[in-house]
Amino acid sequence: MYFEEGRLFFIKSQFNGRVLDVEDGSTEDDANIIVYTQKYEDCLNQLWRYENGYFINAKSAKVLDIRGGEMQPESQIIQYAQKMVEEAANQRWAIDEDGYIFCEARPDLVLDIQGAEDEDCVPVILYERREGEVSANQRWELVPFEG
C-alpha cells in the first residue's frame, strides 16, 4: 500500500469505518490507542504520519507502541515517546497491500480491534493475523487528511 511519508492521514478500520485515536486526546506516554468515530474538526489526536517505520501522532508526537514491549497476542497498543531504531522493535510498523498493520519484528501480529466490537472507545490490541471475512477488524486503510 503506497502512501507519502510525512503526510498526515487517518488510520481507518475496514471493519467499521472508525479511526485510530488516542484515548481522551492524551499527549502522555502510555495512553491507550482506541477506535473512535472520525472527527473533522479538533482531530489532531486521530491524525498520524509515517516516518522510517514509525506511526507518529500529530497531536502528541508520540508513536504507536506495544505496552511493556510485549510482542504477544492481546497486548494493548499505546502511544509512547519514540526510541532509537535499535531499541524500537515494538514501535516499528509496516502495512501490506491487504491493509494489515503489523509489527516489523513480528509480522504474524497485527493491529486488531479488540473483540471485533463495533462501537467507539474499543481498545486496539496486537493479535494473530487472521484471513478471510473474520479478519475485517484487523485491516486498515490510510486516508489522507485534506484539512
Swiss-Prot record:
Keywords: Hydrolase, Protein synthesis inhibitor, Secreted, Toxin, Virulence. Induction: Repressed by hypoxic conditions. PROSITE patterns: RICIN_B_LECTIN (PS50231). Its main location: secreted. One of its GO terms (molecular function) is rRNA N-glycosylase activity. It catalyses: Endohydrolysis of the N-glycosidic bond at one specific adenosine on the 28S rRNA. Antibodies against the toxin protects mice from mucormycosis and thus could potentially be used to treat the disease. InterPro entries: Ricin_B-like_lectins, Ricin_B_lectin. SUPFAM superfamilies: Ricin B-like lectins. Disruption phenotype: RNAi-mediated knockdown decreases cytotoxicity in vitro and decreases virulence in a mouse model of infection. RNAi-mediated knockdown has no effect on the germination or cell population growth of the fungus. It is found in: Secreted. Its EC number is 3.2.2.22. The keyword Secreted applies. Residues 4-143 form the Ricin B-type lectin domain. GO terms for biological process: depurination; negative regulation of translation; symbiont-mediated perturbation of host translation. It comes from the Eukaryota. GO terms for cellular component: extracellular region. N-glycosylase that inhibits protein synthesis in the host by depurinating ribosomal rRNA, and thus acts as a ribosomal inactivating protein (RIP). Promotes vascular permeability in the host and induces necrosis and apoptosis of host alveolar epithelial cells. Belongs to the ribosome-inactivating protein family. Type 1 RIP subfamily. This is Mucoricin.
